[in-house]
UniProtKB/Swiss-Prot annotation:
Family matches, as Gene3D superfamilies: Protein tyrosine phosphatase superfamily
EC primary class: hydrolase
Pfam families: Y_phosphatase
Catalytic activity annotation: O-phospho-L-tyrosyl-[protein] + H2O = L-tyrosyl-[protein] + phosphate
Protein name as catalogued: Tyrosine-protein phosphatase 17
GO molecular function: protein tyrosine phosphatase activity
Gene coding for it: STY-17
Chain residues that bind substrate: D82
Amino acid sequence: WRMIWEHECCVIAVLTRLTEKKKVKCAQYWSETDNKSSKYGEITVKLRETSSCGDYVRRQFELTKNNMTREVVQFQFIAWPDHGIPVTTSSLFRFHKAVVFSQPHTAGPIVV
């Protein structure tokens, strides 16, 4: 979260599920409960909203540090099959479009 804050990132793209064939592929660095806050050093992270969008999940976060607040959105692609590739590219293109269109022109880089 410190890197997100320091580089003024507004968008995070996650291309994997948390587990694949019962093996951890991505550490869950957010709360599962909407409106629950977690503290990471000087940064407080609150999950504001979770939305299921078919092939991906959209999460809206509020980051607070030193009385300053920023919004960050995370997109997690969940349609990637275990140990394989998607049958078609359409779901991945929809995911990419959602990620790119959510990126403000003045923001830092997209974190993948």
